[in-house]
A protein has these predicted regions:
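Flexible hinge/capping segments at coil-to-helix
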Residues: 27, 116, 129-146
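Short beta-strand-to-loop elements that line the ligand-binding cleft
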Residues: 75-82, 149-151, 167-175
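A structural signal for short loop-to-beta-strand junctions that line the ligand-binding cleft
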Residues: 27, 57-61, 109-120, 210-214, ...
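A ligand-binding cleft/hinge motif common to bilobed small-molecule-binding domains
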Residues: 84-88, 102-110, 159-162, 179, ...
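Extracytoplasmic small-molecule ligand-binding "clamshell" domains
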Residues: 22-101, 110, 246
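Short loop->beta-strand "edge-of-pocket" segments that line small-molecule binding or catalytic clefts
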Residues: 34-40, 58, 138-153
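Ligand-binding clefts/hinges and TM-proximal coupling segments of bilobed small-molecule sensing domains
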Residues: 23-25, 155-172, 209-213, 240-258
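Periplasmic-binding protein-like
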Residues: 120-127, 194, 198-241, 258
Length: 258
């Protein structure tokens, strides 16, 4: 009988220890180590940009990341990734959260979790201002001789390849200087997120114009892509809700988008 009780006690201890281990979350780990690892491409203004001279990130989602770190009571460790490598780096657990203009997709949802959306989006053209009336529809764009430029590995390339059958698709690796290709006439247009077309129009006044950014070709949303952890998602969602309600998000948004 004593042996039975001893065996049961050991079993109970093992179950209790296992349950405690299972209760530990990624959120707990982040707080314990004092850092939140944030993956960013650093090539997608106004969301994120890596200044090669200073090796520092800046952008809307950089400011949001810093605000999230402050709410968590931890420092931010930025991990540079790229659009072609984003999924691979996420699966390798190189970062806890991906920020910097991340579009919600089902392929990404399979691998992790998304926060509540931060922005409604959609693909729309940006072209030289003199030509913007030419490219209002997919049918206008998908014509022989039209050069559609895209950056590789993300939703822009995916959208272009799904919709363009007759026009030329030019893949251009540098997402920072890609708009200069349109400005100087080496490409005719790019179809990208409406928020980016507005920002690039502001950077290139009178040269590049966003085409119907208020009525994009498709529906999409931006959100933060999290490693699969319910506690972390709950925290990020609650932080986003409170930041919207107290005006913090709008203040950061205005600094970059208005």
């Amino acid at each position: 009988m004593i042996r039975i009780f001893a065996t049961l006690a050991v079993a109970f201890l093992l179950v209790s220890t296992s349950a405690q281990a299972q209760q530990a979350s990624r959120l707990d780990d982040i707080v314990k180590r004092g850092t939140l690892r944030v993956g960013m491409t650093g090539d997608y203004l106004p969301f994120s940009y890596l200044d090669k001279a200073t090796q520092k990130f800046r952008g809307f989602d950089v400011d949001m990341a810093e605000a999230l770190g402050k709410a968590l009571g931890v420092r931010i460790e930025y991990v540079q990734t790229s659009w072609p490598r984003l999924m691979q780096d996420f699966e390798a657990d190189d970062f806890d959260i991906a920020m910097g203009g991340i579009s919600v997709t089902l392929d990404r949802q399979k691998k992790g979790m998304f926060s509540t959306p931060i922005m409604r989006e959609g693909k729309t053209p940006i072209a030289r201002c003199a030509d913007k009336e030419k490219y209002k529809t997919i049918a206008d764009i998908d014509q022989p001789g039209i050069r559609v430029i895209v950056n590789p590995g993300g939703t822009n390339e995916r959208f272009a390849k799904a919709t363009i059958k007759n026009a030329e698709i030019k893949v251009y690796n540098d997402n920072v200087t890609i708009f200069d290709e349109i400005a100087k006439g080496d490409a005719d247009l790019m179809m990208t997120d409406a928020s980016e077309t507005r920002y690039q129009q502001k950077l290139h006044p009178g040269v590049l114009c966003a085409v119907h950014p208020d009525t994009p070709f498709d529906f999409a949303e931006k959100a933060y892509w999290l490693q699969r952890d319910a506690a972390l998602k709950d925290f990020v969602d609650q932080w986003l809700h409170m930041a919207r309600e107290d005006g913090s998000t709008q203040k950061i948004y205005a600094a970059w988008f208005e």
